[in-house]
């Protein structure tokens, strides 16, 4: 970041914040390469993603040389004019992927610089992980049971690709970079569908994930500007204010350029935003708005959101996309869980002298359930079982070594079990464990051309059991039975805050 900031400081007077020349710098592609390695899909090894050869230094140098020779073709290119386009012709997938990844790194620079300056001005401790998943779970535990209404909101999608370009104009004041952005948007014509609320970030193509991730975040950044009035002084990873729930790449700079716009148009409705009982949380394309207020207040918020998105951002949002429900009678799907607030009724007997009383009490309890049908559907899509949940062998892994097969199955199970350990009922996790364990056994038996029974008898079922429950054994060592009985780990809800994203298999609806 210091190198990028220095570059902009040196050339600020003569280039007017031009970011386009950075495409000709080799370290940009090195940064994109490092990000690709750190953000790989959790159940695939690095070599399967193609990063080892595609992002090598030699290929980056060849790409830069070719761009120097055909600089004008990068911007004025037409997707249909393949004869004039040698840049995207023979190595279209390779070079286009590298340029899009490098371009995503470059357009993030203005956001990053504003983030650093904001952190320095406010003297807030820097954190490498300011993502909503770290604060949403404590919010669910501490606050949700005290609220009355919740609204399910789907982030609207732009009706035209040019809106995405116009959104970035206030951040990127570089005409060549904006033209290049238009080129990528039209080259990947399916990007419009990737921004739709029904699509998730995890469904983005592996080759251009960072590019579309940046576009998605910038789009949602604008959509969430309506909630800027909910913010109080910035908090640092606390679940008591709206600021901690925003899943932003650049966290503390939200209000700098967004506060002025809505005030001019919605002065009469500013009182709506000062309700201290409003809570907003979002992950990817889905968000919730919860309140302790009345149903009328939620209806006013619904009307405001629809009009704000339609008339200010030209985003089509149908009113029926925002559902208002009572928490005590409704469960909502969010962050890979079905969440609800239930009333636990109990009777307390009280005795005073010779008189006794029966007191009916009700306690609100927050419950989370892992969705078994979507999880089995995800496992079936990945060929671990059929649609009925019956385990099958993973034939494409049969050529791998035994240790590699065990490691892959073990990693998938630990990731799913790790994340869904917050479920109130563990029977669903036992079902997932059974599917993956038997699928692993069938895969190994197929490799050795034997039956599952024969293979398990030779290998020993305890080895598979020990491998797939390694995390539970670690917990039993950390918490002795005298102070934290091991059986409670199967009954207690545990949130692991070191998870920075929902795994692909845990994120399908």
UniProtKB/Swiss-Prot annotation:
Keywords carried by this UniProt record: Chloroplast, mRNA processing, Plastid, RNA-binding, tRNA processing
Predominant cellular place of this UniProt entry's protein: plastid
Organism superkingdom: Eukaryota
Localization per Swiss-Prot or TrEMBL: Plastid, Chloroplast
GO CC terms in record: chloroplast
UniProt GO MF annotations: RNA binding
GO biological process: mRNA processing; RNA splicing; tRNA processing
Pfam families: Intron_maturas2, MatK_N
InterPro entries: Domain_X, Maturase_MatK, Maturase_MatK_N
Function: Usually encoded in the trnK tRNA gene intron. Probably assists in splicing its own and other chloroplast group II introns.
PANTHER family associated with the record: MATURASE K
Family assignment from sequence similarity: Belongs to the intron maturase 2 family. MatK subfamily.
The protein's name in its UniProt record: Maturase K
The species this protein was found in: Galbulimima belgraveana (Northern pigeonberry ash)
């Amino acid at each position: 970041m210091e190198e990028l900031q220095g570059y902009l400081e040196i050339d600020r007077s003569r280039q007017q914040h031009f970011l386009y020349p950075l495409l000709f710098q080799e370290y940009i592609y090195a940064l994109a390469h490092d990000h690709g390695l750190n953000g790989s899909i959790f159940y695939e090894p690095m070599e399967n993603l193609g990063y080892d050869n595609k992002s090598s230094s030699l290929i980056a140098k060849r790409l830069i040389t070719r761009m120097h020779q055909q600089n004008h073709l990068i911007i004025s290119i037409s997707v249909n004019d393949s004869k004039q386009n040698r840049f995207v012709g023979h190595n279209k997938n390779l070079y286009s992927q590298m340029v899009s990844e490098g371009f995503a790194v470059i357009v993030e620079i203005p956001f990053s610089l504003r983030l650093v300056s904001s952190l320095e001005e406010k003297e807030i401790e820097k954190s490498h992980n300011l993502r909503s998943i770290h604060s949403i779970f404590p919010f669910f535990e501490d606050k949700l049971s005290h609220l009355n209404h919740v609204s399910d909101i789907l982030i609207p999608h732009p009706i035209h690709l040019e809106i995405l370009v116009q959104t970035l104009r206030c951040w990127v004041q570089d005409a060549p970079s904006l033209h290049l952005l238009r080129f990528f948007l039209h080259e990947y014509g399916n990007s419009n569908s990737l921004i739709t609320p029904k699509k998730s970030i995890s469904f983005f193509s592996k080759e251009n994930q960072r590019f579309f991730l940046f576009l998605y975040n910038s789009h949602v950044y604008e959509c969430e500007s309506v909630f800027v009035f909910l913010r109080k002084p910035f908090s640092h990873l606390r679940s008591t204010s709206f600021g901690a729930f925003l899943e932003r790449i650049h966290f503390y700079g939200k209000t700098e350029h967004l506060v002025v716009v809505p005030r001019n148009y919605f002065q009469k409705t500013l009182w709506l935003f000062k309700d201290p009982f409003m809570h907003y949380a979002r992950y990817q394309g889905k968000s919730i708005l919860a309140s302790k207020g009345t149903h009328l207040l939620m209806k006013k918020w619904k009307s405001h959101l629809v009009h704000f998105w339609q008339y200010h951002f030209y985003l089509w949002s149908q009113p029926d996309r925002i559902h208002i429900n009572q928490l005590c009678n409704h469960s909502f799907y969010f962050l890979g869980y079905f969440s609800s607030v239930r009333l636990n009724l109990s009777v307390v007997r009280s005795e005073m002298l010779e008189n006794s009383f029966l007191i009916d009490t009700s306690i609100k309890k927050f419950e989370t359930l892992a969705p078994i049908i979507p999880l089995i559907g995800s496992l079936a899509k990945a060929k671990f079982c059929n649609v009925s949940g019956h385990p099958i062998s993973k034939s494409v892994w049969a050529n791998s070594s035994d240790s590699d097969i065990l490691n892959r199955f073990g990693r998938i199970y630990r990731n799913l079990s790790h994340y869904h350990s917050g479920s109130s009922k563990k029977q669903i996790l036992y079902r997932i464990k059974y599917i993956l364990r038997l699928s692993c056994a069938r895969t190994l038996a197929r490799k050795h051309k034997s039956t599952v029974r024969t293979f398990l008898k030779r290998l020993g079922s305890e080895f598979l059991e020990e491998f797939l429950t390694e995390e539970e054994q670690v917990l039993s060592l950390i918490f002795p039975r005298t102070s934290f009985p091991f059986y409670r780990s199967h009954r207690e809800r545990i949130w692991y805050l070191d998870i920075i994203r929902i795994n692909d298999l845990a994120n399908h609806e």
